[in-house]
């Protein structure tokens, strides 16, 4: 009887423990103190500093069963999971490690003993093949002369990836870090499975499967590509538990091992699925492992970094559950079966079972609200698609509005042989990021570098200019005593009217000046209790201790004040119009625009946007007083003051009230009365992620400018339509009606022309073994008319096979029609596929009708010429 996965895991650890190895527990899936890694993706991650000589352990040999996730960054297997036999988001890596202890000889001998000894895994020796790095003669000789593997089963692999050391047999965790040559062990499943040995053209087949990678850690790769010898040569090995389990349990797919069979049955039970071969069951069985263990290790679903990868995996699983027909939340119900099947490796998960289940349930419920609508939109877009690629804007809209990660959209498209324009998606994402970034040329880098022990007193609520004294100067993050003309620096004063960026409000700009100098302030930031004025000394020199006159850019500050006060009014209005679930998730207030992120699960309707706009403007017309009070935090909360997202508050807080309409904690600068704002207009509403919406708006002169711009556009349209603003709608309706009528007439003419063309074409059909064959390239015919023409020709010709093509804007459109009495011998889908392949495209359809597209118009004549021979062979 074959070993269970749990028994295999334990046997591996027991074997290496018997060889003097310390059994070390799996580390967290979240790498500690390693910014180069998104997730733990190999057994050696927790020993990286040991290999680098930066850390010492009280053992020189170790063995682990390490939990790993590969679903983001360099090692991203997500898109393949469920569609192949061996790709997973989560897997366990069995490993043994030597830290300056044994090296190549013992590492190879240990591996061979474990794999082939009757006491352990007892694999047939003749089924094992090995590879070595091309120049690693030492490893080659150990395998040949000491282990006794025939030369024909030892394969040297060189730099096969286009660069020095870029080889399947030279291992490196990333662009930098520990690396070295490796030897890999492969298992031959037998000649009944297609595939060739490693290094052969057929190596991607499933016959020869890598089961163990033994890395001889000799170097530390630097950022410039140089290889520095490690302090002590070491060994890092990795053997996928799921892969070796498949070998030992005599199955060819990881999803057929006992662990996955149990999980797949559990998935079928909670979703109501009956076909256990359905790939969606495999996807979900894999994904519950990564999701549950990531949450147990502290990762929460979110819209950035690790949290977003987790969210993507959860949503992919939920979508596959939807495909299986799951009628209610199901994913969280798999945590219990997972704990049971993991055995001792699931103890950490068991302790956190309740929390993991709750997080999964909440996330699934949140996504379920938009999944159906998003899938309906995607189905609609795919139905309209004429080519084989979904545009990036649509993919982004699915992400932005419905929370569809692009790989989920790609999954749906993949099932229909459609690609996704991921470059277009990234362009749309980057545009959103661009809008989200505050264009500050200073500040961010300085924040990380500067440490100021002194404090600055902010007096900008009541003053826009005052005298202060320089208490510190920083250039490139380092404290200096003086600066000269042309130098960029951070100037710290004892007191200042400049507002430092905080609570979403940008820092002030302005000037620090004296008798012999002028310092242009481009930004203002906080450094602990100090306020730093960031900019450039335009003239003269400045030193610590100098007196300065600090002048804030008054006009800019005034515009910021209006925008900030309007943000408070809008927040309160959103809660009235949409509901009290609205809470602030972030904001940006500068002199040009205000941006406000808030919790809401769907795009705002036009009437909701108008209602918010009207409500804010009503408060502006009320000319409410804007008042501030300093009070205890608890008293402010009791008063109902709303706190700002992401801010920390002292025990004494500043409470800002706008009449009876809005009360918030706020340290920003504001107008005196709401009437000062003048006018408020919303210019955009969009999503930043599922459950978070973003509004951008303008006030005062900026709002008036948008009114003028709208009026100018209306005037231009009215002029073009020879009307005026009073009858513009009627004019547009008239033009649209005339356009519809002309389009209808044009369509009728096209159909008449197509019918005439069909009549002319029918005479060109030739007889092939009793069947009429018609192949023709048409010019001036719209692709969508081809189907009508094929239907007409089939009616005219009887037993027939038809292939029509047309080229428009460099793209080939193809259609094939086969009369039903011929489809047992010739299928339209196969025929069109043969032609499409020759013109750089693909397609498909029913046996009697199929369509395709292509990009190589020059190849079309030859492709059409090949139809007669292909059809003749089929009709023989």
Swiss-Prot record:
Keyword Protein biosynthesis present in the record's keywords: the answer is: yes
| Listed EC numbers | 6.1.1.7
Please write the reaction equations for the catalytic activity of this protein: tRNA(Ala) + L-alanine + ATP = L-alanyl-tRNA(Ala) + AMP + diphosphate
* Xref: Pfam families: DHHA1 (PF02272), tRNA-synt_2c (PF01411), tRNA_SAD (PF07973)
Q: Which domain of life is it from?
A: Bacteria
Name where it's found.
Cytoplasm
Q: What is the protein's major site of localization?
A: cytoplasm
Q: What is known of its domains?
A: Consists of three domains; the N-terminal catalytic domain, the editing domain and the C-terminal C-Ala domain. The editing domain removes incorrectly charged amino acids, while the C-Ala domain, along with tRNA(Ala), serves as a bridge to cooperatively bring together the editing and aminoacylation centers thus stimulating deacylation of misacylated tRNAs.
Spell out the protein name for this chain. Answer: Alanine--tRNA ligase
Please name the gene that encodes this protein: alaS
